[in-house]
Amino acid sequence: FYFMEMNTRLQVEHPVTEMITGHDLVEWQLRVACGESLPVKQQDLAIHGHSIEARIYAENPDKGFLPAIGRLSHFAQPAAVEFIRNAAQDARAEPAAVRIDAGVRAGDAISPHYDPMIAKLIVWGASRDQALARMRAALADTHIVGLSTNVDFLSRLMVNPSFARAQLDTGLIERERAALFPAQSRVPHEVLALAVARVVADESAQAARERDDPWASRHGWRLNTQYMRT
């Protein structure tokens, strides 16, 4: 090779490796950086069960997965733990069923200046079927409001027969387009009315808290034109 790129870092999917081996690779990385040796050898490692990672992105799958920006006005996550057991300490214990690696929370903004990934959602199961079931449940408990995300797309992918059977290749999404990108249904008028009522209530509450702040006024006045809100 005239040139070879070296990525001396952990793989993006390292949580999957951690879940099926029970070892904290980030801790190992820090220890090696401090001059220590790896605590185990390759032949000492064993794989247990199955793990799946879903990367929750601020993007619009229906528009070619274009990145989205905005503020996370609501971000509810499934019940999870930060990490897993250490296999070396208790070989009989199982890894956590659900793990979330996230660097944002409700109120934070996803900007165009950085990667639009919101979180990594990782599950473990004794079998692939169990891992899939746990991922479906975890995605169903993931609720994000404020911008477009790929959560619904990932949920449809998890129930796709080809994906469930691990019949995977780079043409899967295009072949399964009809199932993965169903026609959008119209939002009921009742839902729109409730959304408008919530916005008005939130703005009224904020105006009451900031009544002495002229910059908090949002009445929409415009010079030489009629204000119309849509």
What are these model-predicted stretches?
Residues 1-11:
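Conserved metal-phosphate-binding beta-hairpin within the catalytic cores
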